[in-house]
A protein has these predicted regions:
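Hydrophobic positions on the alpha1 helix immediately C-terminal to the Walker A/P-loop
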Residues: 60, 64
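Signature of the SF2 helicase/ATPase Hel1-core->accessory helical subdomain module
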Residues: 122-161
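Conserved coupling/interface region of RecA-like P-loop/ASCE motor cores
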Residues: 1-25, 155-194
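Conserved RecA-like ASCE P-loop NTPase motor core of nucleic-acid helicases/translocases
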Residues: 50, 70-82
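N-terminal pre-P-loop "Q-motif" helix
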Residues: 23-43
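Conserved RecA-like ASCE ATPase "motif II neighborhood" in helicase/translocase motors
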Residues: 91-129
Length: 239
């Protein structure tokens, strides 16, 4: 962030050194290649690939589809949601909307579900039960319906689920200051519940003035609610 007063000469601080960024060239990155190798050898069952935005989940699904040829059906909340996947899949994409797929008798060796967290869990459960192998991809970042409940509820109920995570950004360089600023602004970093609470519990009333007097407190509360899969939305921040 740069603060410039009109009466002063602009002074631009030196940016911290960051690794060079190179746009994706269609070939799998290191993390993608390692996961792709395991998915190709996946025994009958369900695999899930989760990551923050811009890490190449949909691209990975498209690469898998290209290798599978015509042995897979792709579904997603909307046809437009698989545009990235389709760009990596080549001519092998066979897409069906979730409800249409459920009503049909279509069969395939694989089912690939992009943005799986946006599909109602009962419908998703029926779909995955019909195919020998299923790949689910979703983000775990953001508000209700974008992934956190998918991890806490749906994935936790699947026996022998194989989980994979992509951490290296592909759409932008590692350490991108804009990504960090947006994550902080929209409170994307949920409470991970890594440490058990210690000591006695204290009940305390919280009001809107906390944003001015104790800004860390309402932010921590929001992270707690989001991590616990409460129905969070942007409006809560100003409630």
């Amino acid at each position: 962030m740069l603060l410039w007063r009109q009466s002063d000469r602009p002074r631009f601080p030196l940016a911290a050194p960051r690794p060079d960024w190179h746009p994706a060239d269609g070939r799998p990155q290191a993390e993608q290649a390692a996961i792709l190798e395991q998915l190709i050898r996946l025994p009958p069952g369900i695999a899930a690939v989760t990551a923050e935005r811009g890490r190449g989940k949909s691209a990975l699904a498209g690469m898998l589809l290209r290798q599978l040829g015509g042995e897979a059906i792709v579904t997603a909340p909307t046809r437009s949601a698989v545009e990235v996947l389709a760009s990596f899949a080549g001519e092998t994409l066979r897409f069906m909307a979730p409800d249409a797929l459920l009503a049909s008798k279509e069969k395939a060796a694989w089912l690939i579900v992009d943005e799986a967290a946006a599909i109602p869990a009962p419908l998703l459960r029926q779909l995955v039960s019909r195919f020998p192998r299923t790949l689910l991809t979703t983000t775990v970042q953001g508000y209700e319906g974008t992934g956190r409940g998918f991890l806490l509820k749906f994935c936790a109920s699947l026996p022998h689920l194989q989980s994979f995570t992509l951490s290296a950004p592909i759409r932008w360089a590692a350490g991108c200051p804009l990504e960090s600023a947006i994550s902080q602004l929209l409170i994307f970093n949920d409470e991970a519940f890594r440490d058990a609470p210690m000591g006695e519990l204290a009940l305390e009333a919280v009001n809107q003035s906390c944003w001015q007097t104790q800004p860390a407190l309402p932010e921590a509360m929001y992270q707690l609610l989001s991590g616990a899969h409460y129905r969070t939305s942007r409006s809560i921040c100003g409630a």
